[in-house]
Amino acid sequence: YQDQKDINPERVQGTCEWFLKHPKFLEWRRDTIANLLWVTAGPGCGKSVLSKALVDEGLLNPENPDTKTTSICYYFFKDDAERGSGVNALRSILHQLFKQKLWLIQHAINDYRTDGPNLSFGTLWAILIKAVSDTNAGPLICILDALDECETSTRKSLIKNISSFHCASKTTSSTLKFIVTSRPYHELDIDFKVDDLPSIHLEGNQMSEEIRGEIDLVISHEISRIGRARQPPLDGEIQASLIQHLQDQKNRTYLWVYLMLQEVSKSLESTKGKLIGLLGTIPSSVDEAYEKILKRATDPIQAQKVLCLILAAERPLTLKEMNTALEILVMNECGEKYTSENDLVLDKEEAFRKKIMNLCGLFVTIVDSKIYLIHQTAKEFLINKKGRTNPWSPSCWKYTFTLQASHLEALKACLWYLRLDFQDIPSSSRKDHPLLLYASIHWTFHFQQAGEKADKELGENALQICNTKAQTFLFWYRILQKHRPYHHLPAENNSDLLIACYFGLTSVVQLLLWNKPNIDTESKDTEYDRTPLSWASKNGYVEVVKLLLKKEADVNAPDQSGSTPLHQASENGHVEVIKLLLDKEAGVNA
């Protein structure tokens, strides 16, 4: 969570004043009852820079001795599976709180002993409330940045719980306070029910003139810094001309300014005329800037693959992981043969870092050897949320990507990697094989998300590594078991069909049912005594359930606790699966 905060730049002195001096913030900071402040502003207006400054510069407490015991915890959401999780947000906040006040960990011990680290959202929230209610807890301020990038279901749960907490404490002093930042989305208005909350609602968009004034401060500060760093330094007249030219742009945002300043910084031009000429070609919008950046890709095909992998990744990939994944994709496309990792021609890390920057330029950023898109708007540039896509070409990048196609690329990299010969690798040296852990844990998720694009060719590949009698299966599955011990995985000594149904691998299930007409659809796992249909129902895999029902799988087969597939689907809220089972006359009272 610290990396997610620190990826944002520090504020320039004199900026964020539109917020720091606002009466509503000052009132919220003093007040012990009004304890929710929601800050909304459009993309690229510096919300995350503001949140980072609030944490790092100690700007949240009024200046009096009573606030020295205040705990400050934070979470910066990003629109991907790992960083966009409300569960991970609560885990991170509790981790920070317990680090600052170790004695509060007593409120989590019983739940941890019962459920291990895989605690639910509801349990984590309950632990937070118990901890802040401790008489020795002291005040706690939580900053939730970019809440709009939180995954929908846990975002709704977060908002519901924050709202309920504040409604319950609206007449008494509260030790728990929140600052939430987001874009000004109507759906968040509805979820928060702002009119009913004892909250302070600050519309950052209403402060646009002040924000633009502060952006001008950043322009002046950064041009001056760039000018001094040049050899020879840029003279004052050139700097003034550059500043004026950038400040004359009407629709400037922090993000646009950042991209433009990088253009100036990278340029080798040093005369006033040529630098002003450069600015004359600078795009007038962030989207135009993104298009221009990607058109410069030294190898557009490889750049496209890199961006697919970034978009699909369950967590940010490291340079070493990306290097391996990209090499596998390129070698397969070229028809080159390889059987072990030694056959892959990988760059040294620093050389690969430069390669990524040559491929994607300012569209990506690399922090602590992890690769990120420069901003949430970069993802929105590549993927049209409305579903319409444009045909891709090296000169047209906007709206040319889909998540499904991106997951297909990630799936190919993971599947083909896991089919390499790893039999002689001792577990102690697996860290030297950077993609191994990621591929073992996440390939099944990419398979699910690729949908029908996980075609027969990849289905056959997946079928091979789901062969529970093969060493390849045991290799990746044991890694998964080690790193996901509380996910209630079936034991490894089960049928191929049961494993494929557990993970929702539709085309693998289809192949098994086609290739083995007499396959046993009622084989139960050795730990929970559940059938393939029971696992597919529990996990909500509609298409897999349909295939099994077509094979007349027993809809009433009980597990060791007496639960049937219908029980499993009902307990986990899978409505469509419930309907399918009831259509097959599953016993309601079974």
Which residues are covered by each model-predicted region?
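Ankyrin repeat boundary signal
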Residues: T521-D525, A557-P558, A590
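N-terminal flanking helix/linker immediately upstream of nucleotide/cofactor-binding cores
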Residues: Y1-C45, V49-E63, P117-L140, S153-N161, ...
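Ankyrin repeat A-helix N-terminal signature
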Residues: I499-G504, W535-Y541, Q568-H574
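Conserved ankyrin/ankyrin-like repeat signature
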Residues: S507-V508, E543-V544, E576-V577
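Mid-core helix/loop region of P-loop NTP-binding domains shared across ATPases and GTPases
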Residues: D31, Q100, L104-L144, C150, ...
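Ankyrin repeat domain, specifically the short helix-to-loop turn at the C-terminus of the second helix
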Residues: L511-I519, K546-D554, K579-A586
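Start-of-repeat signature of ankyrin repeats
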Residues: N493, Y528-D529, G562
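Leucine/isoleucine-rich amphipathic helices and adjacent mixed helix/strand linkers
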Residues: T15, C45-T70, R83, E149, ...
